[in-house]
Design a protein with these regions (language model features):
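Bacterial N-terminal signal peptides that target proteins for export
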Residues: 1-9
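A structural "domain/chain start" motif
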Residues: 20-70, 122, 172-181
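A short beta-turn/loop motif at secondary-structure boundaries
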Residues: 33, 77-81
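Compositionally biased, intrinsically disordered linkers/stalks adjacent to structured regions
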Residues: 148-181
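Extracytoplasmic/periplasmic, Sec-exported soluble proteins
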Residues: 45, 49-53, 57, 106-110, ...
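Surface-exposed short loop/turn segments
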Residues: 68-72, 80-82, 86-128, 132, ...
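Bacterial N-terminal signal peptides
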Residues: 9-19
């Protein structure tokens, strides 16, 4: 009886393993080609007409690449780079989402839309393109004017770090699903 149970369990296991090999595609470990050792991050363009926002996003992407780029060299010039990360901050909006008892906006939501393209310089092809990165964050104004502290700048800093983490994760962990097995 015990041997029959083992044989049935083994047959069931083999059936499951062999029968479902086409039901998934493995996620890539990295889509970054092996020859890419240096990544250029030129200053992002600012179409949002918001002071220094492009600088914050560019700096955040460079810092995140240095921190998590697995030995990638990071530079700001395109010359000599194996890949280039181009970015455009398309829009910056904030709106009140919570009012105080006097009808004044107390908590604001910031929405930033950006476009990012990663290009292989050697093969002259686009590795990644997302023209609609959307990031949201919020900041709060204090009720008491003596404790007033504008949280808009820290909120933008947090969003730029989140943006950079997303971009670098995409580069380091892969762009999607492999077509071949």
């Amino acid at each position: 009886m015990r041997q029959v149970t083992r044989i049935v369990a083994l047959a069931l296991f083999l059936l499951c393993v062999s029968g479902f090999t086409e039901c998934y595609k493995p996620v890539t470990k990295t889509q970054l080609p092996k020859h890419i050792k240096t990544v250029a991050v030129p200053a992002f363009q600012n179409n949002a007409l918001r002071f220094k926002i492009e600088h914050r996003f560019t700096e955040a992407v460079m810092n995140e690449l240095i921190r998590r780029g697995h030995g990638l060299r990071v530079q700001s010039e395109r010359e000599g780079a194996d890949a280039v990360i181009d970015g455009v901050v398309k829009s910056f909006n904030f709106s009140g989402v919570l009012l105080d008892d006097k009808g004044r906006a107390r908590i604001f939501e910031v929405t930033i839309v950006a476009a990012v393209t990663v290009r292989d310089q050697h093969e002259n092809r686009v590795l990644y393109d997302n023209q609609n990165f959307v990031f949201r964050g919020e900041f709060e104004f204090a009720n008491d004017p003596r404790n007033f502290f504008n949280e808009e700048d820290p909120a933008v800093q947090r969003m730029s770090r989140s943006f950079a983490e997303s971009i670098v994760s995409t580069l380091v962990n892969g762009f999607g699903v492999k077509d071949d097995k």
